């Protein structure tokens, strides 16, 4: 039976021990041409009036998640060995982004919000500011100098690709990368910066573990995903030994309907009514997958510098991806906000599992740091393409019903601040300190 992927994250559908959610996440970004329209109007208008800063705290997790409000893992505080980079405020920034959709040609059409006709621009004039220290803007010249003769990979789903494109755009102000490889679907790519002999890549592996996926680029599936929770995806493990730096992340693919395999047998599933299988829940699979990933990293002979990026919140309102959800806000959140149950669950699993292996990684000579972008990203509902994942979506009718993307990020946009954090962490940790 052919079924559309659907996302229904109603908290009432969660149970405390086995989180049963009738949910399938948005399809991955389509492999579209990277060539941009040279007739695009200038991107950056006059900066808006300066509103007050927007705080990252308090974020109140749902009661059902049982998060410990006073529990702050020590590695979060020490991530840059100076301050907690992830507690802070979004403050007005009149300088705007470091690049435009005219100066960077690595922006996928789905994230090229201004080209696609997004009418507002205030979301471009904010930057992340940690409470206890300054966060310099990304320095592309210094970054490329540090990365001479190095290899770097972003490993994960389409959010990782969104992230690497932000980095490529920032670095393009110094040197244009040369694409030297892409897979058939344009999901995994490799670029080279010739003057620096720096290799940058993105490896598409939405589960990090082995998976059989029967889904087209529009998110239509012909069968349930078969997920092998005790076997890593060779697409990234076979390349791992050649990498000097890694940004790795899980994601919302774990919310999709899936059959779980362990020890050469089916162990259960997530949301598989009528299959006569044990409902284990997405949280079971996510924890098992992360444990396997982190065991591989901490036990590897390759002493890479590894950043584990935490889950990315979406901002769908009045529905989800396939049920009419929208994101039409034009400013960051202010005051208290609640994290969706699924985001809070995934985030807590990430914090717990990374904390368990941080000391072991250090003993083995591996730098493992947390890149906790979840809470700061939660405050930016204004940063998504929304209906402007498509070119001029309302050209034919102002009230047209169009697909909204409230998961990925506009480029330029809030995701660029993730790279400010990356730069600060690598400069203040390990051999670059």
Give the residues covered by each predicted segment.
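A compositional signature for long Ser/Thr(±Pro)-rich, low-complexity
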Residues: 1-433
């Amino acid at each position: 039976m052919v079924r559309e992927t659907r996302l229904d994250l109603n908290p009432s559908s969660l149970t405390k021990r086995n989180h049963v959610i009738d949910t399938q996440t948005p399809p991955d970004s389509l492999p579209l041409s990277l060539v941009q329209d040279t007739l695009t109007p200038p991107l950056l208008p006059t900066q808006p009036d300066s509103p007050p800063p927007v705080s990252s705290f308090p974020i109140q997790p749902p009661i059902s998640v049982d998060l410990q409000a006073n529990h702050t893992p020590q590695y979060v505080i020490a991530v840059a060995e100076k301050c907690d980079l992830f507690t802070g405020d979004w403050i007005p920034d009149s300088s705007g982004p470091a690049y435009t959709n005219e100066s960077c040609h690595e922006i996928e059409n789905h994230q090229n919000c201004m080209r696609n006709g997004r009418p507002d621009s205030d979301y471009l004039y904010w930057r992340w500011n940690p409470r206890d220290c300054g966060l310099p803007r990304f320095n592309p010249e210094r970054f490329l100098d540090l990365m001479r003769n190095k290899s770097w990979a972003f490993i994960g789903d389409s959010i990782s690709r969104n992230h690497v494109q932000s980095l490529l755009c920032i670095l393009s102000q110094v040197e244009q990368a040369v694409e030297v490889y892409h897979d058939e679907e344009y999901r995994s790519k490799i670029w080279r910066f010739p003057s620096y002999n720096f290799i940058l890549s993105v490896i598409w592996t939405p589960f990090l573990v082995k998976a059989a996926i029967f889904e087209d680029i529009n998110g239509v599936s012909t069968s349930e995903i078969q997920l092998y929770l005790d076997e890593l995806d060779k697409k990234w493990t076979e390349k791992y030994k050649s990498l000097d730096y890694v940004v790795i992340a899980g994601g919302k693919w774990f919310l999709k309907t899936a059959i779980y395999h362990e020890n050469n047998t089916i162990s259960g599933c997530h949301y598989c009514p009528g299959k006569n299988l044990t409902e284990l829940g997405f949280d079971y699979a996510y924890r098992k997958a992360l444990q396997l990933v982190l065991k591989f990293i901490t036990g590897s002979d390759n002493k890479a510098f590894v950043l584990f990026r935490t889950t990315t919140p979406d901002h769908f309102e009045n529905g989800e991806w396939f049920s009419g959800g929208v994101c039409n806000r034009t400013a960051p959140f202010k005051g208290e906000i609640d994290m969706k149950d699924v985001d809070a669950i995934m985030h807590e699993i990430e914090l717990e599992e990374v904390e368990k292996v941080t000391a072991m990684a250090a003993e083995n000579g591996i730098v493992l740091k947390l890149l906790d972008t979840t809470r700061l990203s939660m405050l930016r509902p204004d940063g998504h393409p929304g209906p402007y994942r498509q070119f001029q979506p309302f050209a034919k009718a102002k009230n047209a019903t169009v697909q909204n993307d409230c998961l990925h990020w506009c480029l330029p946009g809030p995701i660029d601040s993730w790279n400010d954090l990356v730069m600060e962490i690598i400069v203040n940790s390990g051999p670059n300190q």
